[in-house]
Amino acid sequence: MTSAQIHPVSLIGGGPGAWDLITVRGMRALQEAEVILTDHLGPAPQLDKLCDISAKELIDVSKLPYKKSITQDKINELLIEHAQAGRKVARLKGGDPFVFGRGFEEVQALAQASIPTTVIPGVTSAISVPAGLPLIHISKP
């Protein structure tokens, strides 16, 4: 397979929790994907509200303490394997791909395999969750 046949892997941050806080770009990448690797965090349980999942291969790569756990090396292998097969791959993560998300490790593994990535960050909870608290409060002039 030539590199022209390899699609960039989309690394998508799902935002701070609720399924409808994902970005429009993230939702579009999920709609275009043929294979989606998901965590147990973020919008993964409501994926069917973001795209038609009937023709997609969904791979649960959750890391749960004392339960099922996929190693990061195995996740990297799956991303590379599906991308090299010419499939459109999305990696959906809860929150932001790089804040405790090990996104850099995935980008690095893909780069070592000469597979391009597209990073679609999630909305940061500090500025997105309507908690009624200001992001910055200065009470003195």
Regions found by a protein language model. Name each.
Residues 112-113, 131-134:
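Alpha-helix C-terminal capping segments
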Residues 124-128:
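Short alpha-helices
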Residues 1-19, 24-123:
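Class I S-adenosyl-L-methionine
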Residues 49, 129-130:
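Short Asp/Glu-rich motifs
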Residues 133-141:
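Residue-level detector of conserved catalytic or cofactor/ligand-binding positions
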